[in-house]
Amino acid sequence: MKNIIYFFVLILSSMGLFLFFTSNNDLSLSNIPKTASQEDVVAEKKIPDPEKPIDPKADIGPQNKLENPPSVIKAIYSTAWSASSAKKIEYFIDLIKTTEANAVVVDIKDYTGNLSYDNNIELVKKYGAIEVKISKPNALIKKLHDEGIYVIARMAVFQDPALTKARPDLALQSISKNTIWKDYKGISWVDQSSKEVWDYNIAIAKDALNRGFDEVNFDYIRFASDGNMADIKYPFYDAKLQTKRQVMNSFFKYLRENLPGAKLSADLFGYTTIHQDDLGIGQHIDDAMPYFDYIAPMVYPSHYNKGFNGHANPAEFPYDVVYYSMLKADQRLAAFNESTTTIKTVDSKFRPWLQDFDLGADYDAAKIRAQIQAVYDAASTTETGWMLWAPTNIYTKDGLLPK
């Protein structure tokens, strides 16, 4: 009897289990709530994209302008090649840390017309006007800024073989040869009246400023002078409509309008300090005063003609040449500032280029110091600085005051 009872119990139990697992209350894995760890186990693992390797040649991001820049700029000049050399940069930094110098002028567009660093300026890339010498311009700016050094970007404007090659329609033409005109050094120029040329150079200046350069220095902002002037045919400039001075004055104004708020400086011939005409190249120092923060006449004594101020060799008299030139310049700036008819957009100051190279005389420490002292003695303000030009980028340290 017990065996029969056990048999029925076993049958009932088996039927119950069968109904339990086949009922609508399904307890399969798919309906069991998952914990976070379970979600991770069940879900398909997504393999992350591999990190892009860091390009050792890549530059850092744009830099801010130097905080608290010096009120009186005392600069040395550097070619792009020197700026690309770690050893040379350390030389500049050491010179500045141990002397009164506090700024560096760096070539970003020299007489070749090529930009010295890679960039994304549309027309520059289109024209192939790049020769990378400075691989990391932003990093260079940071390195100099970290040392408290003011950094100026120098660019040649109308002397531009790279642009004349890409755009011969913008170039000065030779009447006799029916080719692109070149000066005595074999360098070609673009038409100073071309708005395309103006905009092209402004785009370059904007790029430099956006990278963190504290200032842009414009050189070769003039008409050509060294060559057969009678053989020049201008594709745009028309002497019947405008004088050369009017063209350059319009260009100066255009620069300021398109680079508002930027620190700008202009390199002018030294003779503009004493001449009342435009020297046949369109440069008149008074025209630069409304638009440039710093005007930089190149008062190299070796560049003055024999007989200047009674000197058979002006290069031997650096103090006299620089003092006389800067005194006349300062008098003209004072008259400009006192005029009630002038329109000023900036508080312009003089910051001349001085000679630190042997030409006409051996330029030792005494001659370097004489030029600097002449700048100070001629100025009516203590805010006048200077820039030293040494093509070798090797400077006469003893001509500078120690820190």
Walk through the language-model features, giving the residues of each.
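Active-site-adjacent "subsite" loops/lids of carbohydrate-active enzymes
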Residues: N64-A75, W81-A83, F158-N210
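Aromatic-lined carbohydrate-recognition surfaces of secreted/lumenal glycan-active proteins
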Residues: Y77, Y150-D160, N217-F218, A224, ...
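Glycine-rich, aromatic-flanked loop segments that form ligand/cofactor-binding clefts
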Residues: A103-I108, S135-W181, N217
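Aromatic- and acidic-residue-enriched segments that line the glycan-binding/catalytic groove
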Residues: S116-G128, D160-D183, A224-A239, Q283
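Substrate-binding cleft of secreted/luminal carbohydrate-active enzymes
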Residues: F292-K306, A315-K403
